[in-house]
Amino acid sequence: MSLKAIKYSNGKLEILDQLLLPAQSKYIDVKGVEDGWKAINKMQVRGAPAIAIVGCLSLAVEIFGEKFDTKQTFKQEVEGKLNYLVSARPTAVNMKLAAEDLISLANALAQDESISVDTMKERFLKAIEDMLDKDIADNMAIGKNGADIILSHIPNGGSVRILTHCNTGSLATAGYGTALGVIRKLHEMNRLEHVYCTETRPYNQGARLTAYELVHDKLPATLILDNMVASLFKSRRVAAVVVGADRVAANGDTANKIGTYQIGVVAKYHDVPFYVAAPFTSIDLKIPSGDRIVIEERPDREMTHVGEHRIAAPGIACWNPAFDVTTADLITGIITEKGVFKPAELKEKVEQIISTNQKL
C-alpha cells in the first residue's frame, strides 16, 4: 500500500509533514486557510496536485462549521480565500486552476435562485471533497498511459530501468502519484527492473521523499547524486526518464523542479526518451511558452544550510530558483490521464478535449 499524505474526513484535515521526512512521520492538523497557506508556502506539503488539494481542503475545513447569512456573503468569502491560497506558491498552476473552477462554481450557485445558502455551501464542499477521489483515479490513469507508452518501445516483454527526479508520488498527490505512478504501474506489471532517483538539491526531495516512498513500497531502487545523471546514462541502459510538472505551457515547455532541464539536455544527448507525467490540469494554454512562466525563488538558507548546520561559506551570494523550464524540443511525450501527447500537438489536442467536454 502506498503512503497516504493527506487525510480528510468531515471537516478535519491532516497532512504528513514532509519537512520531517524521512526521520519522522508526523501528521499535522490544518485548521483553516491560514494553516493551509503556511503548509504550502513552507513546503510541509508540496507537489502541484497536492498543493491544490490541500489548499482547497483547508478552505473546506474553514467553512465546514461556519454559518452564512447570504449566498453573496458566501461567494465573496470563498473567492477571497481561494485567491489568497494561490499566492502561497504561484508557479504550480493546479491551485490556480482549482481556484478558478471553484470561484466559477460559487458564482453559478449564487445565481441559482432555486437553492438556499446552506445548499450552496453543501454543494461547494462536495466539489472540494470529490477532488481527492478524482486525483487518485487520474493518477492511476496516468500510470497506465505512461507504462504503456514506455513499454511500447521495449521488445520481447523486457523489463526497464527508469530515472526520475524530485518527488511525484503519494507525497505529491492525493495518492499513487504521477511520474512515480508510472513507475508503480511498471512494477505492478512486473516490468520494472530498477528505478534511479536523484537527490534533488537543495531541498533533497528525491533523497528524503522519493527514496522514502520507494523503500516503503519495496521497489528496486538506487539513489544517485544530481550530478551523476550523465554517467548513469553512459554506463547503464536506462529506458526512459519520467518526471512530473508544476506547469506545462501551450507549446509543451515544462516547468518542474530545478535540475529537470539539465536532465533533459543530457537525455537528449544520450538518446534516452524523456517523458513528463502530469494531470491534465497542469497544462496551461494561457501560457504560450516556458519563458512566460513565473519561477519562484526560494530563500538562500535552503542552499546554505542542512537543517541547522551551515555548509556554505558565510557571506557568499546565492541564487535559488525552485524550478526550471525544460524546453519542448527535449520532451518525448507528455503523459496525462487523457492520453500521451507530443509537445508539437499538445495545444491542438488539449483544445479538442476541452471543446468536446464543453459540448457534453
From Swiss-Prot:
Gene3D superfamilies: translation initiation factor eif-2b, domain 1, Translation initiation factor eif-2b, domain 2
Annotated site residues (Transition state stabilizer) in this chain: C166
Catalytic activity line of the entry: 5-(methylsulfanyl)-alpha-D-ribose 1-phosphate = 5-(methylsulfanyl)-D-ribulose 1-phosphate
GO cellular component annotations of the record: cytoplasm; nucleus
Alphabetic keyword roster: Amino-acid biosynthesis, Cytoplasm, Isomerase, Methionine biosynthesis, Nucleus
Active site: D246 (proton donor)
Pfam families the UniProt entry points to: IF-2B
Entry annotated with the keyword Cytoplasm: yes
Localisation: Cytoplasm; Nucleus
InterPro entries listed in its UniProt record: IF-2B-related, IF-M1Pi, IF_2B-like_C, Initiation_fac_2B_a/b/d, M1Pi_N, NagB/RpiA_transferase-like
Pathway where this protein functions: Amino-acid biosynthesis; L-methionine biosynthesis via salvage pathway; L-methionine from S-methyl-5-thio-alpha-D-ribose 1-phosphate: step 1/6
Keyword Nucleus: yes
Any single GO BP term: L-methionine salvage from methylthioadenosine
E.C. numbers: 5.3.1.23
Disulfide feature: none
EC category: isomerase
Gene Ontology MF annotations: S-methyl-5-thioribose-1-phosphate isomerase activity
NCBIfam families: eIF-2B_rel, PRK05720.1, salvage_mtnA
Protein family per UniProt: Belongs to the eIF-2B alpha/beta/delta subunits family. MtnA subfamily.
Family annotation (HAMAP family): Salvage_MtnA
Function as written in the Swiss-Prot or TrEMBL entry: Catalyzes the interconversion of methylthioribose-1-phosphate (MTR-1-P) into methylthioribulose-1-phosphate (MTRu-1-P).
Protein's UniProt name: Methylthioribose-1-phosphate isomerase
Taxonomic placement: Eukaryota, Metazoa, Ecdysozoa, Arthropoda, Hexapoda
